[in-house]
Amino acid sequence: MFSAGAESLLHQAREIQDEELRRFCSRVTKLLQEAPGPATVDALQRLFLIVSATKYPRRLEKMCVDLLQTTLCLPASPEQLQVLCAAILREMSPFNDLALSCDHTPNTRQLSLVASVLLAQGDRKGEIRCVSQRIFKILENRQPEGPSVRPLLPILSKVIGLAPGILMEDQTNLLSKRLVDWLRYASIQQGLPYSGGFFSTPRTRQPGPITEVDGAVASDFFTVLSTGQHFTEDQWVNMQAFSMLRKWLLHSGPEDPCSPDADDKSELEGSTLSVLSAASTASRLLPPRERLREVAFEYCQRLLEQSNRRALRKGDSDLQKACLVEAVSVLDVLCRQDPSFLYRTLSCLKALHRRLGEDPGSERALVPLAQFFLNHGEAAAMDAEAVYGQLLRGLPSERFHSPTLAFEVIHFCTHNLALFDSHFLSLLRLSFPSLFKFLAWNSPPLTAEFVVLLPALVDAGTAVEMLHALLDLPCLTAALDLQLRSTQTPSERLLWDISLRVPSCLEAFQDPQFQGLFRHLLRTKASGSTERLTPLHQVLKPMASCARVTQCAEAVPVLLQAFFSAVTQTADGALINQLALLLLERSDSLYPVPQYEARVHGVLSSQLLVLCKLKPSLVVELSRELLEFVGSVSSIHSRASVFTCVVWAIGEYLSVTWDKRCTAEQINKFFEALEALLFEVTQSRPLADLPCCPPEVVTALMTTLTKLASRSQDLIPRVSLFLSKMRTLAQNPATSSVHSEEGAESIRTRASELLTLLKMPSVAQFVFTPPAGVCQPRYHRDTNVALPLALRTVSRLVEKEAGLLPG
């Protein structure tokens, strides 16, 4: 989120027109030809804002672009101007008028700026190879007074990411050697301050030793967690080298366990020889890549030891936690490339896991720790269930409000789906209530991740409980909000906190009467049971309009679609029946978030039809429940879309064609119930406090009644009479006060169409209950047997015999 002032500046930058931009470029061109000053800096800052504020590239005058390149390459140009020029040129890339070259740049700082612009071109003219060759030429210089490599390491990391295959074998070995030097042999004395001042004495300028985060004097080599007032150049390079270490190991390591660089150590995994090899004292004689792995392992072990110290400053404590995550990730890479590191790593990681449970704030390290045990747990013969349980259950319940943790945990699950065995998948499925807490609190950024994850979470044992949980997701968001606020003191809550204005929500959260429902809603694992949360829906109604709850509600329809797409792939008949009943039950039991009910009803109604298509016999098997559902007028007014689909499904699938158990008695029961309902919503006077019945429901009821009558032909005169009345009623001007003109016309048209078909009962039965062969493409491609042709022929015959039946 930007401040109002920043938003205003961005808006102005986006709205600037080409003519105004041309005039501004002329001013920038003039300033770049003069001596640099504050006006030049200000103009370049404004130009950078203009070119970076829009998604499409801005076109600048050629002279302006040429001067930007000239200023960037001039050794005498102030550093601030060079940085701004490089930033503007990067935003404009790629473009054809680039005249930069990294071959003649006088210093590494300027080379890093020029190289950043060249890499932004996208390797159109071999820029990446040119940049990498120039950097490696500098790396070959081992003179202490040589140019500083610190500005080049970010560029080198970018080169590795853009084109990892561009480096030659000798370049790979050279960089591995340099990384060994930078990581292992940085100075352990603090650097000198930039200026000691006129009155400083030699004693005050003498550098002191590097210290640990707890203030103790460092007794081992320098790392990124070493502290001091000032750092030397090689110490800064040490920090940057660690930041690119994992990327370089992944690039330079063996492509597979059988490659020569691995020395076939995968075959020795678990053997005494592997352990002896790992403990070898001749590591300095190893090839460059293996030597780098040894040094990287030592560096990470040192970081794990340093992270166990109690930091004196909060900034150092935060850095400890970040380095812990990276160190475990690097160790994972090392053990994958060389299994001889595995047994030296396990003991320290087991100790780390015990410590993570005691050290609040270090939970992020659980994700790489779980990844490590997932990759190596079987080889190490270690049961990592405690790590997985803490990651999938404890962490979401305690840290659901951390967006970073939420993304990392869910990304871990989606990224490793192919690696999960049946035991882990079972643990994952049982943990879905905890994972849903991340989703409920961070629904906009995590919705796409959960769409990928849901198929792995759904099985026959969790499907019903999970569907309840998805429908109650906005309610879970409100409950998590209250859980978080209940741990705060009144003075810690913000003035806009809704719980201050509606204290009943917090009181209900602490009320023993609702504790059981809240415990069920906030459970950490699947319980195998369901609870009706209607009392909570009413109690938490004041929070239904909260922004976070509304955002969560908007994600539910997408998640429901993903859920049904997954569950319908494997659901058996019993589960389909359960899901169909659940849809009917929950369609009138949703948390009252604005527009939530309508969106969810749209998904539920469409998915009910999918379930019926998968198992048409469910209409007969659930006839009692469906009769109860369609027997109430309230179902029409509260859930019209679901009701319409239920009525359609009855007309489509209540037939001997789909289920031999279907009887005439069942057809008559449904006919009488729907006939009475249609009479009630059309013939009786509508109540003032109830909306009128939608025309879509009326036409669906008429169609279903006609379908049922075509299957029990003694009902045809009865439905024909009713349809005649409906047609007359729709033509009555008084109907316009109940339905719109379009709605009344649709009712009249449908009644006329149905009456026409009923005049020839055998044809009506063929149309409304076609044999299975009609679904074959032949009926739609062959003009001699096409169904539309048959209907047109019947229509002409009926028109000639209009007096055959009353109507």
Curated annotation (Swiss-Prot):
One GO cellular component term: nucleus
GO biological process: autophagosome assembly; autophagy; axon development; double-strand break repair via homologous recombination; endosomal transport; gene expression; Golgi organization; intracellular protein transport
Keyword Transport belongs to the record: yes
One protein family per Pfam: TPR_AP5Z1
UniProt subcellular location: Cytoplasm; Nucleus
Keywords on record: Cytoplasm, DNA damage, DNA repair, Nucleus, Protein transport, Transport
InterPro entries membership: AP5Z1, AP5Z1_ARM, ARM-type_fold, TPR_AP5Z1_C, TPR_AP5Z1_N
Superkingdom field: Eukaryota
Quaternary context: Probably part of the adaptor protein complex 5 (AP-5) a tetramer composed of AP5B1, AP5M1, AP5S1 and AP5Z1. Interacts with ZFYVE26 and SPG11.
Function, in words: As part of AP-5, a probable fifth adaptor protein complex it may be involved in endosomal transport.
Protein name: AP-5 complex subunit zeta-1
Species: Mus musculus
